[in-house]
Amino acid sequence: AKHSAGEFELHCDINNPVTSEQLPTPTNIALILHTSGTTSRPKIVPILHSNIVSSAENIKRSLRLTEEDICMNIMPLFHIHGLIAAVSASIAAGGSVWCTPGFDALKFFRWLDDASPSWFTAVPTMHQAILARAQRNRDIIDRNKLRFLRSSSASLPSQVMKELERVFGAPIIEGYGMTEATHQMASNPLPPLEQKPGSVGLEAGPKIRIAHETENHLIDGTGEVVISGPNVTPGYENNLEANKNSFFTFEGERWFRTGDQGAFDADGYLSLTGRLKEIINRGGEKISPLEVDEVLMDHPSIVQVVTFAVPHEKLGEDVAAAVVLEDGSKVTESDLKAFASDRMVDFKVPKKIVILSEIPKGATGKLQRIGLAETLGLT
């Protein structure tokens, strides 16, 4: 299948079968999911009942959800984002969920009119597709006022965040989540607290710290983001090597390595510089693809961008980017390189910019940096 995660083996204790009369306990497995596989082969993640309850309560508290709220769910329910943020958190609050058959930009505004929701949650690529059709649906937006919008599962460009707030007249709350955390780890707060574009916000459930990228201890400054809390999976299914590399104990506390590089500011807001495996190493110079994304997104003709590594004979890796332009744009690769050169040091400027009608995405709507060079024939 096009989006197959591969074949996996699940293991159970056949000597202690569970009978239908037994009710699940907090430590029983509730869900068996797999990671999105953005940087490696997907891994099986068992999620406990206690993980779901903890995460749903965290999200309910962050978003101040009540029984008056209606969430319009456009996220797939085979993945943690929709299952926990849209459905489980709403149920925990006693609210309502209006389920669509799946995301469709052409039907989104009709659904918005039918559902009259107070909020919805989506990945950045969905938000960008919604913005592309927003102007022609201005009347629907005006008569269906949202309390807030939410974005998670990938970095939301600050330009897109500001445009969503302008178009919908509501705050856009960016959260930081992953399957192993039963979704949410951090979240920008609702007003009147400050939202910081480019940041994934404050701790919103588990403890979040910064760890040394290769040694098992916590540090100050920039490093690997790690988490600890009751929402964290007990470990990957039948994968001793991944568990050894992803979990460690420091001063009596168990920490999970997210694989993301980041740092806190003075106010406790967390900013990510990218997946560690996606950081571009250009002859020893480490380049965050998110930083390059942010610069290119300032170009008025660019509506979507993803920066990634391409092989280089002498440097090991070099910088490349794929972009989608506004309809009718005549901007060239040379124009975009010149734009980037005026705003970045030379070694960060993409040496190749590919203009596409659509950037390849994974099954959950995430842009895929790893493997994109090969997909586009740049290897």
Regions inferred by a protein language model and the residue ranges of each:
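Conserved AMP-binding/adenylation subdomain of ANL enzymes
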Residues: 53-70, 80-118, 129, 133-136
